[in-house]
């Protein structure tokens, strides 16, 4: 499914089912289709993750929390405002979908109109051996990304 309107409807249905306080939740493939239609991808992982694990070309980078301290970025909303207009749809990405969930929630509360969380994140869920990038996620889906 690559039609942005269909993706938005499905994401909204997921939001209702999951009780999400933002526009919706999308798969990595759906997020990529929304990007092609003009949505901004905001990567909220740490600088270390982006450098060592990989990044998505054309994405904006606004850390949700810092590494190694794990402290929430107090300038998150200000940095987000510098990166993305409040009328631009945003798909938020982290490693697994947790930090991006909170980013979408906070951005929605601050007035961004159309925020989505990318389910599975960049690396996806852990497999039986506790490894990521083997079950799902942006990388495994074969979507564009580059190292460092």
Regions found by a protein language model. Give the residues of each.
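Structural scaffold elements adjacent to functional motifs in cytosolic proteins
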Residues: 41-43
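Short, surface-exposed ligand- or partner-binding patches at beta-edge/loop junctions that are enriched
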Residues: 92-93
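Rhodanese-like catalytic fold shared by cysteine-dependent sulfurtransferases
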Residues: 1-37, 47-89, 100-148
